[in-house]
């Protein structure tokens, strides 16, 4: 399945109707969230369920240790827990029935499939709370609803074609309204065989169509996302060979037989952050000026009960700046996705097999739990001008800001999608056994180095740490170790490619000492 996003030609009437329908979808979703919260609270307070959950945990420990009887008992307890949840109404079918009652009130605007999609989204959150690492299901603001989607192309939103209308042959029909589609250039040949991407996509069967809205500083703009059956038309000609990829929170290194890549992910995201921070300071100052009664003397916000439910007031300038901030966040997100796509396209054009070490960026984004002191003493001056050596606490912050700005996990998601589309090979090694950042193929040993050490000496050559890790991944023998024979054969050529790449980067003024080492 692949998607085609097409802009819609809207007017004030259709935009007003779309806004009303998004409000109804938000109401259905949040009412379902309220219902889910109520059921989860009842489940948590139930002594019977808590007893079953405790028993299940004890049996799971025994079953994991190899106790066959405990495994059978665990399955029986799991069935009891499922039956108890079903009796409360904590199931996908029960949520669909609950949503159907609300949808009937708004059937002129929202059909049953569109309401069921919202029920499925809430149920996905409930499943995370019940079976995953989720803590609670949350309400969503009206501005957070970006799409209204159905399940098929037989009801709800239709993407249609009228061959008799030469000016606007394509349009979207939703209930009683018809919205023309702004078609892109269909004459331009953007495929290797001389075809057009849009026209080739339109030849596929349509699975369903959804309405999407994106925020610009001038307001909402609406698009039709058409989902087609089958793979997307292929714009690229995949290369041959093996490429190793070593990705970090803010950089990516890739090495194949004839290409070396060392790039910063989304390098201009800092510019967006500066603009956003500057506007947010202005918004904060304006908010404090127009709402002085809602702040304490120390600058903190008062509790809602202290200002008696009075609404917040914002100046027109403040509202305009808030709109700009929302647009900057959207542009920043689209920029990072675009840059990741460019890097992945370069990789696909060069290789057909991609080897990488899996990274848990969610864990890297979290703060450290343990409180530790630095190994190196710091000399400080006291008020009486005497000096004292102290061991300061280590910072608990890790890579949360980089992960948020650079979206490193999205790069691998795009690469996996491209591999599925072009039928390429994508493989993840065992990171606990492979340890590409520690291995030295000349001595066949593992030496752990500090994160700040970006270069190391291998076989008398100075190699960049990330590029060398990518090289070792490209020389994979099996999931736990690289092939030393292949490493010895390709290492001299790798050193030449690395030195040439670093020289070109320095000549072009590309430098990040903390990440690249230069």
What positions do the PLM features span?
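Generic detection of long, well-ordered alpha-helical segments
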Residues: 15, 19-22, 108, 112-120, ...
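Acidic carboxylate diad motif detector
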Residues: 56-217, 395, 400-401, 405, ...
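Short, surface-exposed linear segments at secondary-structure transitions and domain or protein termini
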Residues: 16, 186-201, 207, 250, ...
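Positively charged, helix-rich recognition surfaces that bind polyanionic ligands
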Residues: 3, 220-518
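A generic secondary-structure signal for well-formed alpha-helical elements
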Residues: 29-36, 40, 126, 130-133, ...
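Long, compositionally biased intrinsically disordered regions
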Residues: 1-111, 291, 295, 299-303, ...
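Short alpha-helical "patches" and their helix-cap loops
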Residues: 42-50, 135-144, 484-495
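Stable alpha-helical structural segments in soluble proteins, enriched in small hydrophobic residues
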Residues: 32, 117-125, 129, 467-477
């Amino acid at each position: 399945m692949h998607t085609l996003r097409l802009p819609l030609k809207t007017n004030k009437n259709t935009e007003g109707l779309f806004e009303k329908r998004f409000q109804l979808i938000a109401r259905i979703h949040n009412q379902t969230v309220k219902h889910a919260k109520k059921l989860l609270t009842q489940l948590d307070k139930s002594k019977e369920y808590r007893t079953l959950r405790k028993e299940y945990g004890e049996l799971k420990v025994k079953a994991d240790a190899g106790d066959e009887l405990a495994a059978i008992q665990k399955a029986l307890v799991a069935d009891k827990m499922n039956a108890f949840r079903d009796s409360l109404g904590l199931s996908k079918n029960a949520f669909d029935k609950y949503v159907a009652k609300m949808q009937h009130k708004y059937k002129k605007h929202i059909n049953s499939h569109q309401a069921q999609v919202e029920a499925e989204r809430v149920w996905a959150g409930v499943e995370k709370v019940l079976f995953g690492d989720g803590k609670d299901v949350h309400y969503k603001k009206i501005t957070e609803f970006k799409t209204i989607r159905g399940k098929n192309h037989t009801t709800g939103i239709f993407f249609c074609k009228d061959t008799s209308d030469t000016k606007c042959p394509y349009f979207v029909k939703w209930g009683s309204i018809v919205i023309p589609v702004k078609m892109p250039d269909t004459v331009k040949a953007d495929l290797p065989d001389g075809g057009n991407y849009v026209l080739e996509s339109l030849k596929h069967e349509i699975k369903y169509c959804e309405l999407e809205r994106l925020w610009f500083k001038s307001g909402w703009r609406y698009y039709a996302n058409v989902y087609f059956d089958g793979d997307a038309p292929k714009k690229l000609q995949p290369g041959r060979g093996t490429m190793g990829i070593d990705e970090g929170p803010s950089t990516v290194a890739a090495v194949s037989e004839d290409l070396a890549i060392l790039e910063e992910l989304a390098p201009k995201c800092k510019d967006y952050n500066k603009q956003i921070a500057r506007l947010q300071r202005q918004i904060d100052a304006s908010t404090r000026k127009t709402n002085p009664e809602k702040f304490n003397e120390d600058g903190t916000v008062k509790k809602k009960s202290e200002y008696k439910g009075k609404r917040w007031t914002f100046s027109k300038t403040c509202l305009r700046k808030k709109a700009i901030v929302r647009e900057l966040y959207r542009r920043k997100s689209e920029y990072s996705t675009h840059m990741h796509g460019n890097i992945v396209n370069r990789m696909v054009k060069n290789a057909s097999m991609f080897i990488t070490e899996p990274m848990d960026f969610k864990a890297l984004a979290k703060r450290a739990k343990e409180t530790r002191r630095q190994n190196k003493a710091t000399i400080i001056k006291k008020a009486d001008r005497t000096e004292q050596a102290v061991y300061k606490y280590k910072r608990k912050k890790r890579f949360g800001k980089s992960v948020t700005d650079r979206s490193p996990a999205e790069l691998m998601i795009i690469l996996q999608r491209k591999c599925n589309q072009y039928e390429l090979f994508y493989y993840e090694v065992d990171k606990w056994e492979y340890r590409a950042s520690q291995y030295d193929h000349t001595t066949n040993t593992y030496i752990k180095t500090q994160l700040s050490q970006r270069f190391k000496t291998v076989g008398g050559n100075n190699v960049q740490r990330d590029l060398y890790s990518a090289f070792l991944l490209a020389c994979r023998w099996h999931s736990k170790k690289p092939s030393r024979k292949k490493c010895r054969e390709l290492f001299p050529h790798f050193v030449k490619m690395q030195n040439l790449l670093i020289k070109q980067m320095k000549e072009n003024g590309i430098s990040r000492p903390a990440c690249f080492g230069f």
